[in-house]
C-alpha cells in the first residue's frame, strides 16, 4: 500500500481553499449575459470554447492532491446542480466559493464549525421559502422564450425555438438537441409516436420521391415474436383485405414467406401493407409494444396472454389516422386508443420514473412518457464551424433545462437579484448561539456574490450595483447587465427559474458546509521516480 500524506487544521483548509478558488475563478468568468468564454484544450482536435460552467468545472484537474480535493468538491456542486436543475451551475459555484471563504475565516478565528454549519443551514431554509413565496407562475409563451434567452446568454433565437418546442410538445414531451449539418438552426416537431425502426423491405414504399411508406387510416398488427409462417398470418390478411384498409405489421422480425407474401401482394396492388421490426429489446420491447397497443386501441399479440396469431380478429388490431414509415423511423399519428387508457398508462410510467434509481432507466421511461403524452421536438443547432456549433449546443442544452424548470416551479427576477432580495427572510431567524448567528451572516454576505460577479463580468463595479439595488425594496427591481439599465426585471424579460436558483443555493451550501467542517485531509504521497541506471562506459561490450 502506498504511503499517505495527512494534513490537519488550518494547513488542510488553506490547501483546500486554494483548490476551490482555482476552480471557481475559472468557472465564474462565464456568469451573466456578458460572461466571458473559456477555452478548453483537447488532446485531439480543435480546442473547445464554452460559456457553460459545468463544462469548465469538469475539465479542471489540479496537480496538488490536496488542492485537487477542494476543487473536486466544488465541481460536485456544479455537477449536482446540473443534474437536478440543468442550469445554474456557475451561480452555485460562485455561492459555494463565497460561503467557503467566509466560513474558513470564521473557523480560523476560533468559531465552532458545526454551529456555523447549523446557522448556514437555517439561513438557506429561510431563503428557499422566501424564493418560493415570491415565485411567479409561467403561463405565456413569451415568458418561456425569455427564460430560454437568459439561460442561453442572451441568444434570442434559442429562446424562441425553445418556446415553440415547449408549446408544441408540452412539458411532458421530449426535446432533443442535435448538431445540424448546415449553418442554420432549425426545429423539427414529430407529432404522434415515433420509434427508430424502418421498413423491412424497400418494396413497401408508396412515395418513391421521399422513399417512404404512407398508410392512411391503417390497421396495426402488434406481435411480440418473429413472424415466418404464412399460414398463421393468412386469416388476418384476408380480414384486412376485405375491409379495404392498409395494414402495418410490427413484430420482433418478419422473414421468409411471411415477408415475401405481403411484398408480392403490395407489388400486385392487392393490399397496401408494410412491416417493421418492434422497437427496443427484451422487457423494454414488451413495454413499448404495450404502449403502441394502448395508443392505437389494439392488443399486443403475445403468447403470454394465450392469444394465437391464427385466432386474431380485426377488433384486436390497432387503428391510427396515419402511419409514415421511413428507412430508419416509423411515426404513428393520432392513434385510436381511448383517452382514459392512455392516461392510465401515463400515470403508471410516471410512478415507475419516481421509483427507479437508474438514470438510464429514468431516461428511457421519460422517452416512453413523451411518446404517449406529448411528442418529440428536435432542435438542430447550426453554426459556421464545429467549435461554434459545440459552444452553441452547450447553451441550448442549458436553456432547454431552464425552460423546463421554469414551467415546473415558476420564475423569479434574474441577474442574481432574487437572492439579494430574499435576504430579508434572514431577519426573522431567532437563535441565541453566536456562532450560528455568524453562519447566518455568512449566507447574507454570500447572497451578494452572484450580482457582484455578473456586474464585474459586464465591466461594472459590483459594490456600486449592489448599493443601488439596496436603495429600492421592490422584489422585481434590478440591474439588466445586457442593457446596463435599472428597472423591473420582469418587464425586461430578465427572469430565472425558481428551481435553478433554489438548487444552486442548496447544493452550494451543502458542499460548503462539508468543506468548513473538514479538519483533516489524507492523500497519497507523490511517488519519486527511481534514478536511471548509469550510462554504459565507452568500449563496453553487451
Swiss-Prot record:
What domain of life does the native source organism fall in?
A: Bacteria
**What keywords are annotated for this sequence in UniProt?**
ATP-binding, Chaperone, Cytoplasm, Isomerase, Nucleotide-binding, Plasmid
The catalytic activity, as recorded, is: ATP + H2O + a folded polypeptide = ADP + phosphate + an unfolded polypeptide
GO biological process terms, semicolon-separated: protein refolding
Q: Which residues bind ATP?
A: 30-33, 51, 87-91, 415, 496
Self-association or partners: how does it assemble? Forms a cylinder of 14 subunits composed of two heptameric rings stacked back-to-back. Interacts with the co-chaperonin GroES.
What family is this?
Belongs to the chaperonin (HSP60) family.
NCBIfam families under this entry?
GroEL, PRK00013.1, PRK12849.1, PRK12850.1, PRK12851.1
How is this protein named in the record? Chaperonin GroEL 1
Q: Which organism is it from?
A: Sinorhizobium fredii (strain NBRC 101917 / NGR234)
Gene this chain is encoded by: groEL1
